[in-house]
Amino acid sequence: GSEMCIRDRLRGTEQKKSNFWGHQRKLSKSWYDGSTGLLPLDDCIKSAVKDGYSHHIPRLMVICNLMNMCEIDPKFIYKWFMEMYIDASDWVMIPNVFGMATYSDGGLMSTKPYTCSSNYILKMSNYEKGAWCDVIDGLYWRFVQKNISFYSSNPRLSFQTRVLSRMSEDRKVLIFKKAEEFLETHTQS
């Protein structure tokens, strides 16, 4: 009863302070007006601005995914969602942002971060391949590479390290460059 409620509230308080990955970047203005140049992300942001709402999948697999892969400090991700969504409330946003979406709590709620490349977005939407794919792929594979020991030791993610190791050096150079350019333009250190 009340003991469980208090324990869960304390867990939420701790979860809100978590930053498993140690991310420190901040969002630039483009994350508020939908001018990042990544079509799926910009559409999701503009929808949030217009409606104050979006389905769970765009929230999780587009917006949070990209914020996490851009190394945005989770407290700024949480702040963004609290500002942008009409249904924003701690009981929703703390577990969604710090737990499920970013894995900032280190696995209190989930066994892995929800990260994906452009392939998932293409499969789950009507978007066509474009320049945005290389940027998202660069952010994704950069995240995997930076966290290679975590990915290697997680049974649900270890196959990604093998995919990365087989990727051509030319492809890596191209997409990592696109990722770094995006980070430089659309995040603040």
Task: Indicate residue ranges for each PLM-predicted region.
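Short acidic alpha-helical/loop segments enriched in Asp/Glu that coordinate divalent cations
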Residues: 10-18, 60, 74-83, 93-95
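Active-site-adjacent "gating/activation" loops or surface patches in catalytic cores
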Residues: 11-50, 54
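C-terminal substrate/ligand-recognition segments
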Residues: 55, 68-69
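Alpha-helical support elements that line or immediately flank enzyme active sites
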Residues: 63-67
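Beta-rich accessory regions
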Residues: 163-189
